[in-house]
Amino acid sequence: MNQEIMNLFNPTTPAQVFDQIRISIASPEKILSWSYGEIKKPETINYRTFKPERDGLFCARIFGPIKDYECLCGKYKRMKYKGIICEKCSVEVTLSRVRRERMGHIELAAPVAHIWFLKSLPSRIGLLLDMTLKDLERILYFEYYVVLEPGLTALKDRQLLSEEEYLRAQDEYGQDSFTAMIGAEAIRELLKGLELEKLEASLRVEMQETESDIKHKKLAKRLKIVEAFRFSGNKPEWMILTVVPVIPPDLRPLVPLDGGRFATSDLNDLYRRVINRNNRLKRLMELRAPDIIIRNEKRMLQEAVDALFDNGRRGRVITGANKRPLKSLADMLKGKQGRFRQNLLGKRVDYSGRSVITVGPELRLHQCGLPKKMALELFKPFIYSRLDAKGLSTTVKQAKKLVEKERPEVWDILDEVIREHPILLNRAPTLHRLGIQAFEPVLIEGKAIQLHPLVCAAFNADFDGDQMAVHVPLSLEAQLEARVLMMSTNNILHPANGLPIIVPSQDIVLGLYYLSILREGLPGEGKLFGEAAEIEHALHAKVIHLHTKIKYRWEGLDENGKQVSRWYETTAGRTMLGQVLPKSVKMPFDVINKLMTKKEISGVIDQVYRHCGQKETVMFCDRIMALGFYNAFKAGISFGKDDMVVPASKWKTVEDTRTLAKEFEQQYNDGLITHGEKYNKVVDAWSKCTKKISEDMMTEISAVKKNPKGGEAQINSIFMMSNSGARGSQDQMRQLAGMRGLMAKPSGEIIETPIISNFKEGLSVLEYFNSTHGARKGLADTALKTANSGYLTRRLVDVAQDCIITADDCGTKLGIKMRAIIDAGTVVASLASRILGRTAGEDLRDPLTNKVVVKRGTLMEESHVDALQQAGIQEVKIRSALTCELVNGICGKCYGRDLARGTPVNHGEAVGVIAAQSIGEPGTQLTMRTFHIGGAAQINEQSFIESNFDGKVTIKNKAIAKNGEGHLVAMVRNMVVAVTDADGTERATHRIQYGARMRVDEGDMVKRGQRIAEWDPYTRPVLTEVEGIIGFEDLVEGQSISETLDESTGIAKRVVIDWRSQRGGADLRPAIVIKGKDGKILKLARGGEARYMLSVDAILSVDVGAKVKTGDILARISTESAKTRDITGGLPRVAELFEARKPKDAAIIAEISGTIRFGRDYKNKRRISIEPVDTTEETREYLIPKGKHIHLQDGDIVEKGDFIVEGNPAPHDILAIKGIEELAAYLVNEIQEVYRLQGVLINDKHIEVIVRQMLQKVEVTDQGETDMISGEQIDKIEFDQINAKAKEEGKKIATGTPVLLGITKASLQTRSFFSAASFQETTRVLTEAAVNGKVDPLEGLKENVIVGRLIPAGTGASMAKIREVAVKRDKLILDEREKQATIVPSAPEPEPLALPTPEQS
């Protein structure tokens, strides 16, 4: 209590108002100005009296008193002596809190290098002096002397001399003829002697003169650091310390334990070592000890200071008494337990509790059940104040007693207090913002929190022992925000994809599905009913059944909102659903007059939300939840063993496949196919078999059976559960009653022998053993992937945290093009789904009438999208975060619709964090879901193209040949088949693979679903373009070709082997040539000879002397064997894309359009050049490693951006060759691909936001007449600013190219050093920032959390805006007053205007 009174007299200093924070190197003078006194002794506190020793590490004279307002000796006590310094013990009488603020210092007897600037790479001292780290360490740790002033001697400036060389030089030249020093003093002198202006000028000159690339880079680095020191006002010699600051004692406490021992912070030990060694050095210097001893002591001092700043950075780690490394100052900041992440970004909060959750089906959507005991504890302060207000208690003590006794009036007051006071529920792990939601508490008995079933999906909660935490928002503002922004009723849509997340699942779905079933031939079929009451009566009287087909008169509203009645053919159950539907024009009975699966219900909720608003949706959800639960209970659905129907056709299918597998085995034995092909084909056959059995099982289970009376029998329960989406997937049913199918090895390869049994029949021992792989891998993956996914989310949040909506419209004309994504003939993502909720980037016109359908700048709602679909528009230009031109943040138009609200996005919305959560959250979900299918292998390989539309075929770059078998074969790589409709609009374009069999020709009409082309997905062919006779070149047995006898078959097959590794094979160039009748090599139409180069591992399909027709296969190259894909391959893939890593076998991409020419080969590289079509460009050369299959031949024509060597393209190449839009499309599609495989929907805009953050930097290619350095990476914004300035001054501007940074790199290079330091590599970031004297503008979220302010997003953004307005207005008023004061000096003083506070405004 008296603490509070004291605080009244000592008002806390108001919080400083600042806009930015600067970090720089502390000069010795600065350190002394912070200090309150020098620490001379290593003692801490007296172990008997527990009082701090004078001049020691805890000295009260320097740091302040231990008890409030009491000096150490006790002469002065109490407030009245405030500020007096006791003459006996020299301690100032003040608050003990100053011991957290006051610093001390240690005067070093010899200067010491700061290890961060020495060892944190790149070494700043090393760069400035242009010395290697090794040499620096030799000088600093007293091994070598360095020459500072060579004088007239033959020594060079900065030459290193060992002890003997130094002594010899002194003898030779005389002691005073040159100056050489050793240790940190020497380095300090060198740094002091640097003339930065001159150095910078000479470096710039040198850079322009140098030819070598490496040297240029090194000079650029030096120039950058020289500039940094010049502009930041830091002096280079400050990197050498002469004074060491000592942090306040309360930040490195020493606590006495019982038994006379002490627990102490490691820093005290480290400081003690420094002080001991420093004092010893001082004494030795006073005693004029021999040089060698002093030098050793100086080296030890340097090591002690190194350990204090960053223990373990150099040399041995210094350990404490228990062999544990001591935590140095750097370790205090670093890592998860460091100051940044533990205390500044993650704080513990008061007023919280946690308990187990149970289900609360009778709650409303905005409620949760809170145990009375918890409520009483959490709302204590409110209860106390209420008791006081009601006069039931006069003091807090009394109130406490009342509450502890749990008097009846306390419960009444608790009810009052809780009413309309929202509380927050949180379930860890909080992967996205829906992991914390606000509810109104309902008091319940018991000890478990009750949760509404519909919000479980958002929390990812279930009731198998999950726990949740409760938090109480205290202030009125916090309560308001909780109610308006976080209430569960305000979070109906998922921020990741805009679909409802308040969706019934499991029992509710099953109940609703059961309710909406329609079965033929039930009693009472065809009866007419006028209203719901009649139906209810009939049901009770058992005249009709829930599923009976009846006629029903439904009363609704027509388009004009008038009452209308219509007859519907429906069932009794569906009329019940009709009762809970909101009455609206847009909600006819048709919406629910169908079989309700989970997907359908989700659709209905979505429609209700779009047409009837939020309130109706919430009420509707609550009603259908009750209906679903009730009917699931009434239906009493359960299943027995016989409900799992094994299809009758199973064994026949299995036998057929076995025969097929045997055939492939035989073909392999006969040498017709390779081992790899056989493997692929067998695996393929079995997966087809599994699929067929699965389909047969589904048809048998779902078949409508008749009962003896001629009516329909009950529907199979398992089918009902799976079909409704309540529980279980088709895959799980297949494993129960079909066949388990193929299994994967832990390495990801598929085992050739499948598991033929299902769980109903039971597995054989071998099958069981084979299936253990998948199950174990699943469990192991789960553990590993959770961590990986969490780390990915953290990196994403870090890179995107300062992406905030800061304006309505940036006014850009740019945008990106969107079209539907089609894969293997199926539409994977429709154009409609991709452009919904985005802003049109141009006027969209109907291709037939040329009428504008959607104006530029319109936010596309559902109605617009429908109009576009009807007009048949295939491609739409939309605004995107990638092309937004705002300097800070993103504008609302470029972002589009706020997915979680379904409205245009608000100012201050933290879209970056939402994007990161949306991408990261399913990562964890998926990783936890790998083993749901028990590792059953799923293979997907595309091997054909189907038309999605009816239309006419047109072929671009046509080159088709008829081969020996009479099939049409595609002969080029850039052939495109387009399907056009009647009026000539292109509906679809397909790139045709080389060697594909064409099923259509130019001008053919195709129907939807008709095959256009097909190919073997497992091999790549080499085709002949001319008819003739085969000849071999350089195909030498044992050198470039090996005829392998397959052990199992005894049949020879010829494979090209690596000829460069064989003796005498370096100059071979194996190829197949086509000769004419005269034995000469034929010429090709496109120039060049008919010579086909072969790569390693090619399998020959022809023999010397054989006749071939155009389009015949000469050789085949096998592709990789099929691996299973699941998100375990997926998560690393997503990380790889976001980190912009170069893939393992990167594709080589043509940088220009032109003709391929093969050059001379190197030892193990093959040289290819492209002769450009455009003669102004120069020829590009590529060196391709051996063993890579180049599927191009001499003289082929390639387009810019085509692949020369297959593989995954490196994102950097795409950016360089095709530009930003292509890169964005590639990244978005590749990432979406991974998530789509798992059935996860994420809106493209989230990925675009992250990609925008990866493209923030520009690499300067030509510096022009600016201060930038060519080759350096600089922020896009800074780059533009510098260029604008140069333009104003009429100088030549710099040019640059956009650079793609991975998310980790981008996070570390943000403009805010606070954000970067709290992310990773804290030491490096802080060192760099200090050298550059960086200023943190505090724009992002993290920086503001760290300095303890409101974040500039959400309500914080509007507060900041109001404050800005207020400051401007105040300034105007004050300026006005000053003017008046200067005009009329004699006038009486005006009344002060009442300035409204920012809050009022």
UniProtKB/Swiss-Prot annotation:
One of its GO terms (biological process) is DNA-templated transcription. Zn(2+) 1 binds at residues 71, 73, 86, 89. Its EC number is 2.7.7.6. Binds 1 Mg(2+) ion per subunit. Mg(2+) binds at residues 462, 464, 466. Residues 1378-1401 are annotated as: Disordered. InterPro entries: DNA-dir_RpoC_beta_prime, DNA-dir_RpoC_beta_prime_bact, RNA_pol_asu, RNA_pol_N, RNA_pol_Rpb1_1, RNA_pol_Rpb1_3, RNA_pol_Rpb1_3_sf, RNA_pol_Rpb1_4. Pfam families: RNA_pol_Rpb1_1, RNA_pol_Rpb1_2, RNA_pol_Rpb1_3, RNA_pol_Rpb1_4, RNA_pol_Rpb1_5. Its cofactor is Mg(2+); Zn(2+). HAMAP family: RNApol_bact_RpoC. DNA-dependent RNA polymerase catalyzes the transcription of DNA into RNA using the four ribonucleoside triphosphates as substrates. Belongs to the RNA polymerase beta' chain family. This is DNA-directed RNA polymerase subunit beta'. It comes from Rhodopseudomonas palustris (strain BisB18). The gene is rpoC.
